[in-house]
Each structure stands twice: as structure tokens, then as C-alpha cells.
């Protein structure tokens, strides 16, 4: 029986490249001359720390980072940015988290969405991913379109497509 897995992963190497590109752009921009403005990628926590001298500049840096992530093939919805910007001394910073894996609430929404579609497929939650099996390849492709079309707040990839 044909099957595939629905996962949500961020390629850390591409994220590192995007952070490096964003840092290079900030160094060359006129409005950031003489200003302490940095990006720091933490591989262990899968977070990106955006630091600057004002909250307005932190928001500008986040826009630059989102643009660079998008150019590297990482969707902006995979970056979880908290609402509040932390003020510490003379700097402002925000710690944005890269979404890895699918949370259980989102997994349940996806499975419910698939079951409500009345397609002849089965969806099983397996840890951080969802395995979808069905008799017809067309049904599986319909499920892929359904998941892509659903507004679930994070990007999904489809792996291990077996016929």
C-alpha cells in the first residue's frame, strides 16, 4: 500500500546560511552603521537570537532575517517569534525559535482534517510525524494538497513516499 510521512523540519545548515547572509547585509546597510546589531544561531536549542540597540531595529532585523530565510527555502512560519522584545541594559533582543516537529495539537488537527475529508486513507501519529497510508496514489496526493492548503501555522514536508 502506498504511504508517506508528514513532517515539519528545518534544515539547520540552510538556517545558518540565512543567518550569515542576514549578518552580511546588516554590516553593509547604512542605517545599521555604528550600531550593535547581531544574529546568533544556537544549534542545540534551535534558536536565533536577534540583538540590537532599539526595539524598532530588532523588528527591522527580524524582517531581514525572514527575507533571507525565505530565499534559502525556509518558510517564515517556521520561525516562532515571541511578541515581547526583552530590554537588557542598552540592548534589546528577541529569541526566535525554529519549529522542529509537529506538536500534538497540530497533529490531531491534521488527522481530523484528513478523516473529515472522507478520503480512503488512514493517518497515524508516530512521534513527531504522521504516517498516511491508502490504496490509491491519487488519494495520497489529495491528502498532500489538503495539508498544504490548511492554515496550520507551520510548513510541512512529505517524506518516505512509498508505492
UniProtKB/Swiss-Prot annotation:
Q: Tell whether Isomerase is among the UniProt keywords.
A: no
Record Pfam families? DUF520 (PF04461)
Q: Does the keyword Nucleotide-binding apply?
A: yes
- A GO molecular function held by the record: nucleotide binding
> A cellular component term (GO) from this record?
cytosol
Keywords tagged on the record: Nucleotide-binding
Lineage, top-rank taxon, reads Bacteria
**Entry's family note:** Belongs to the YajQ family.
Biological function: Nucleotide-binding protein.
Q: Spell out the protein name for this chain.
A: Nucleotide-binding protein KPN78578_03700
Source species:
Klebsiella pneumoniae subsp. pneumoniae (strain ATCC 700721 / MGH 78578)
Q: What is this organism's lineage?
A: Bacteria, Pseudomonadati, Pseudomonadota, Gammaproteobacteria, Enterobacterales
